[in-house]
UniProtKB/Swiss-Prot annotation:
The keyword Signal applies. It comes from Aspergillus versicolor. Residues 1-16 form the signal peptide. Notoamides have been shown to exhibit antitumoral activities. Notoamides A-C show moderate cytotoxicity against HeLa and L1210 cells with IC(50) values in the range of 22-52 mg/ml, but the IC(50) value of notoamide D is greater than 100 mg/ml. Moreover, notoamide C induces G2/M-cell cycle arrest at a concentration of 6.3 mg/ml. This is Notoamide biosynthesis cluster protein N'. The gene is notN'. Part of the gene cluster that mediates the biosynthesis of notoamide, a fungal indole alkaloid that belongs to a family of natural products containing a characteristic bicyclo[2.2.2]diazaoctane core. The first step of notoamide biosynthesis involves coupling of L-proline and L-tryptophan by the bimodular NRPS notE', to produce cyclo-L-tryptophan-L-proline called brevianamide F.
Amino acid sequence: MRAALLTLAFTALAAAADDATTTVGFFGGGEWENSNDDDSLPLIPSYTSIGASVVDVNAVETVLAISCLEGAATESCSINDPWTMTQGISSFSWYAEYTAFDWNPPVTATLDYNCAYENYTLSATCTYSMSYSGSSDGAETSTSFSTETSWDSVATYAALEVTGGLDKFNQPEATETPEGGAGFAGPIQAMVTAAPVLAAGLLASHASGAWRKGKILLIKPFKGILPRLARLEASVKSPNPYRNEPLTPNLDIRAPSSGQCNASLYTRHHPGCFDDDIDSLGQVVLSSQVLGVFFNRLCRVEFVCPDAQFACRECQPVFVDIHCNDVPSTKLPCCRGRKQTNRPCPKNKHILAWLELCKAEAMHRDSKGLKDNAFVKPYVVGELVAEVPRQAEKGRQRAMDNIARSRNCGKGHVRT
């Protein structure tokens, strides 16, 4: 069985023409894996010209009814019964039935998408199913597809035009928690109106004319522009999803037979922020060896775009976050762009200098525990117990000196 990567790119990009129209966001999920035995991916019958109306909103969930925009041609949008979409603080559901007349033969399709999650960016489990069938002039077609997956962190969300019921966001019920429900301060509108609007603008700036016209593409092969959009959306949604994630493989020092636990350095390359040379740092193994025992530590470099609406424009302020096990994160402010070339993003050699400090910090911390480690004691004699921490401290200081030299270019920014 070969796995095919998919992405859910739920998008309805439509400009707000007047005060009666706005754009809200909804849960888009992450990267999907096709569990079918073959590599073929079902095409999703297309539709355009849809809009939503707010049915109900409270502090726990927002319910939307989705139908065709007024005056939409039947060929682009044919919905008999409005779709129901429910965006909650811990769940999401969307059920849709429609007819796609631009297919030959025309088909009637059904989509069913349900998710449960810890919050909008963490611990999501989703099921998705789709089926369609149709016949005309002797031609017949039908298919069905379903999948289920889960993610530790969620990468995407999407935008949808809302043309009715906006006054419900301003009603007292919008901030009230239903009986038996667990709400939060303020209606879910805060989630569905702010960042997703930004994502819609980003998608419009990168995507084809069909996307800008509001065409919705549900499941497409994970290739081409879609993975770039997914990563860019992730930088808007959660600039640093690994902030609270454990950063060590936790190699058991009492079991050296487990061998060297190789820990990779992960880089997140956000379009519009960094040149491709950053990708050469994709795999770096950091390990320190003390008296034949491996002390492995995972260091991660995180490329963050906090102002993602300016991505791919003239000057993109970014941060490089360097994480190391039990070592505080280090932020390097820099700028990639034409306007402020005096504040460039760090080159590989400067990032590697920080990684050396990360490695030295881990080794120094490990070495200080040698005296009390029951496994190491039989192999440590006299001055070796003191010498290892001294050497580790020297390495730590040397790395810090290198960092000081590399950043000595004014305003604390890393020079190239």
